[in-house]
Amino acid sequence: MKNIKIKTAIFYADKQEQVNLELLGAKFIKNVSVLDLNFPVYEYKNIYFFYIHSQIGLINSAIFSQTVAVKFLITNIINYGACGGRSSIDFSKMKNQLIFPKRFYLLDAKTPWYQPGQLPFEPKFYENNLLATQNFNLGSSNSFIFEENQVKDFQFVDFFDMEAFSFAQISAKNSLNFYCIKYLSDKIGQNLDILEVNSNIKQGAQSAAKYALALLEKI
């Protein structure tokens, strides 16, 4: 693969979301260094890609995705991972479904002059998920959302996580193709037991990772 251009990076934030890609048909090629950490390069059906554990939080996601974008000149960012749902979401119905959000908001952005979720002088939201087939809004925060009071100003947001907004923003600012795949692990005010949440994260990661690998052949 010496002269092969790697154009895609698959990012996940929580270590519980990591999947053994070799069991899904991918082949480990080598490790690369990103911010003094080693991450694998895999090959799947003759397509090479980076598999990056960005770690939890908006800042980590932004740092790792920007570094990978600049260092390796990728053109595609795929982010898969767990998210929480509003209390109005039917958790049992949606638990095993993949979610493809349409808009991304920053839950930590609140000012007297802009609508909730908008950074000053930045777009109101990002709408660049090339997989978006559902009219869902996702909000990202450095806080885990577990109470309705935390998002009382965001009644228009359906799902919550701690990284997708950063991936959407970095993709937009670097003119990268962005693909976001989410799935439910919890719901505001319910099923907050850490063991149950982690179990849901691990279970959902399998189908999300399979989808991400299949996507490689189409982008």
Predicted regions and their residues:
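A short acidic-Thr-Gly-centered motif at the start of a beta-strand
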Residues: 1-3, 151-152
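N-terminal beta1-alpha1 ligand-phosphate binding loop
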Residues: 7-33
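Glycine-rich phosphate- or other oxyanion-binding loops that anchor nucleotides, phosphorylated ligands
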Residues: 34-219
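Extreme N-terminal starter segment of soluble prokaryotic enzymes
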Residues: 2-9, 47
